[in-house]
């Protein structure tokens, strides 16, 4: 039977998933070679644990983005993330935010008068998705009924099913002026950090909308506030912010035509169920000597 440690704290749902995979969860000891790490905010604690246990050969991380653990994943061992696990709820949230923006829901919610009669439609629109992972794969399925023409910008411009065209990062500036809706769904790396700034917003149509369900620091927050208040773009919806959590009174809360959700594209209820599936899948594969799902590439950073 496989022995695996869960640190820093094991949760009942994950213990059950491990048992269903035929694994035994044990306290960390010198014989344990597999670790399921369940803390989202303490990379130093994981680093110290790995220093103390050089026998560990595989670490399962609980999140899709591993930017906070960029130094740790360079260690000579196998790391797997939860990338792809949360694709359905996150893509669903991105679609909901997109429709809310285009149908001017923020304005409708707060108004106390009949107001202007205006809305955009997602049907037959041009959509640019920045990033080409599991969330994008799911988004392409959700967008298909709207007859959208979707351009995917990704590091590896291999074609994606459902996309009108798939292009490399170097084509971003060329394609931004064509998009009615821009959705950020890429990993946060040194290449994508603060990539969306005043220069990128200036390339977008003044009627275009931005949706960020990736990472907050992919967007320069001050530049986004300026772009919204000066009507450089028509609106934005963000499930992630920089800083995060966004402090009360921060200027972004009062920017024009902004929707902010508190990183709830995947809630704890959803995460527990979906990450339990990943635990089961990878523990079974590990025990059988088969390839694991969600392997992290230390060079790419995701």
Predicted regions and their residues:
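Short, conserved loop/helix-junction motifs that constitute active-site signature segments
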Residues: 47-55, 71-75, 201-206, 227-232, ...
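Oxidoreductase and adenylate-handling cofactor-binding alpha/beta cores
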Residues: 91-107, 145-146, 277-290
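Rossmann-like adenosine-cofactor binding region
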Residues: 157-251
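NAD(P)-binding Rossmann-fold cofactor-contacting core
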Residues: 145-162
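Phosphate/diphosphate ligand-binding glycine-rich loop within oxidoreductases
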Residues: 34-110
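N-terminal glycine-/charge-rich "phosphate-binding" loop or analogous flexible N-terminal tail
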Residues: 1-38, 287
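Glycine-rich NAD(P)-binding loop of Rossmann-like domains
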Residues: 107-138, 165
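Rossmann-like dinucleotide-binding domain for NAD(H)/NADP(H)
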Residues: 213-302
């Amino acid at each position: 039977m496989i022995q695996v440690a869960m640190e820093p704290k094991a949760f009942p749902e994950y213990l059950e998933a491990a048992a269903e995979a035929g694994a035994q969860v044990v306290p960390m000891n010198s014989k344990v070679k597999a670790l399921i790490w369940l803390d989202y905010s303490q990379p130093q604690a994981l680093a110290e644990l790995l220093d103390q246990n050089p026998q560990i050969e595989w670490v399962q991380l609980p999140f899709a983005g591993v930017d906070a653990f960029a130094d740790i994943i360079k260690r000579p061992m196998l790391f797997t993330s939860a990338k792809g696990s949360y694709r359905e709820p996150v893509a669903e949230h991105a679609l909901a935010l997109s429709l809310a923006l285009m149908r001017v829901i923020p304005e409708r919610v707060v108004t106390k008068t009949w107001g202007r009669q205006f809305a955009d439609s997602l049907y037959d629109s041009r959509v640019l998705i920045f990033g080409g992972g599991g969330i994008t794969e799911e988004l392409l399925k959700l967008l298909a009924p709207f007859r959208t023409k979707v351009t995917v910008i990704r590091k590896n411009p291999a074609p994606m099913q459902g996309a009108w065209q798939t292009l490399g990062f170097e084509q971003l500036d060329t394609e931004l002026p064509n998009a009615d809706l821009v959705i950020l769904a890429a990993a946060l790396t040194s290449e994508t950090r603060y990539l969306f700034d005043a220069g990128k917003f200036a390339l977008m149509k003044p009627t275009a909308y931005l949706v960020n369900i990736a990472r907050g620091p992919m967007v320069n927050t001050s530049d986004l506030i300026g772009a919204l208040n000066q009507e450089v773009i028509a609106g934005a919806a963000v499930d992630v912010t920089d800083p995060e959590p966004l402090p009360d009174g921060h200027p972004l809360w009062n920017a024009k035509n902004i929707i902010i959700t508190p990183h709830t594209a995947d809630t704890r209820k959803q995460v527990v169920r979906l990450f339990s599936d990943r635990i089961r899948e990878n523990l079974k594969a590990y025990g059988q000597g088969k390839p694991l799902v969600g392997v992290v590439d230390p060079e790419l950073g995701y």
